[in-house]
Regions:
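Membrane-embedded alpha-helical bundles of multi-pass integral membrane proteins
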Residues: 2-301
Length: 301
């Protein structure tokens, strides 16, 4: 009689090391995630409310949607306006693309993989497994390093080079610190998982090269079940919650800080006037006008 053993494709187990109480964790993460989302929406609402104080626009802002979308995509991909200062542009581009990779290809796909792949479709290994999972892992590692290097460049420029035109603010320091710690704790959590993965499926671990570096560090200090640290369960769970909490704090801080430019800048590009630069809209009923020009902020559009 021949027994065929199932060979598992490469995949990442959701809530690894916490699987025995993952349902409670899932409920808790959803409940806690609502807080920063509300803060984000509230912060953007305050900005929208400020915009609404202006006068109604005389130019159409929602025409030629294809052209507007093209301008927005070109602006996002090239980061053209940021490279007037090379190092500022480099830092911004690395942080922007690194963040987008980690959020959309990481957090969002993981959520889809869990709720659609495992919960709805009942797939044992989720939607993303095999070669697709390995490629995703490598891309996420690149995103993590891009974010870290971008933060380092921005910090050196802000606190070491100190260009005269750059305004120093506590808010900028908080943003850079949050981004850096979120990225590092993400690699740390991954490294603890990969340290165990190396013992069963070492060929998978090379694709997650950032986590692989941390895994070797943890192994060197004994975080592999041998002295001086005999269990990684506590450190892993603690680091996971720190990473999760700071990620939520970062999302909530977007709407209340200069990070909201992620949305406002995109809106400005998409809604910009497509008329020739400097064109003045016609003044209706010019003979009846009692006021000329603008003397208050609320008189601007």
């Amino acid at each position: 009689m021949i027994f065929l053993l199932e060979v598992a494709p490469a995949f990442r187990e959701t809530f690894w090391n916490m699987r025995h109480w993952w349902k409670a964790i899932e409920i808790a993460t959803f409940a806690l995630a609502a807080i920063p989302v509300i803060l984000l929406i509230y912060g953007l609402y305050l900005r929208f409310k400020l915009w609404r104080r202006g006068q109604p626009e005389r130019f159409e802002r929602f025409n030629l949607l294809g052209r507007r979308l093209g301008l927005l995509v070109r602006y996002l991909l090239t980061q053209k306006k940021m490279f007037n200062d090379f190092w500022a542009g480099a830092a911004h581009a690395l942080i922007f693309f690194g963040f987008c990779i980690l959020f959309f290809l990481g957090a969002m796909l993981d959520a889809i993989n869990l709720h659609v792949g495992e919960h709805i479709l009942g797939l044992k290994y989720g939607l993303i497994n095999g070669p697709a999972y390995l490629v995703q892992s490598a891309i996420l590692e690149c995103g993590g390093f891009m974010l870290i290097f971008g933060v380092i460049i921005a910090a050196l420029r802000r606190y070491v080079a100190r260009p005269k035109h750059l305004e120093q603010s506590r808010q900028a320091g908080i943003i850079l610190a949050l981004l850096f710690i979120v990225a590092i704790t993400g690699f740390a959590v991954e490294g603890m998982r990969i340290e165990k993965e190396m013992q069963t499926n070492p060929e998978w671990s090379y694709w997650s090269f950032g986590g692989y570096i941390f895994a070797n560090i943890f192994s060197a200090i004994g975080l592999d079940g041998t002295p001086p640290i005999k269990s990684f369960h506590g450190p892993h769970v603690t680091t996971w919650w720190i990473h999760f909490a700071l990620s939520l704090a970062l999302i909530g801080y977007i709407g209340l800080s200069k990070l909201r430019h992620m949305f406002t800048s995109a809106a400005n590009i998409f809604l910009q006037s497509l008329h020739p630069r400097g064109e003045v809209p016609p003044i209706e009923k010019i003979v009846e006008q009692e006021r000329w020009g603008t003397s208050k902020i609320v008189l601007f559009s």
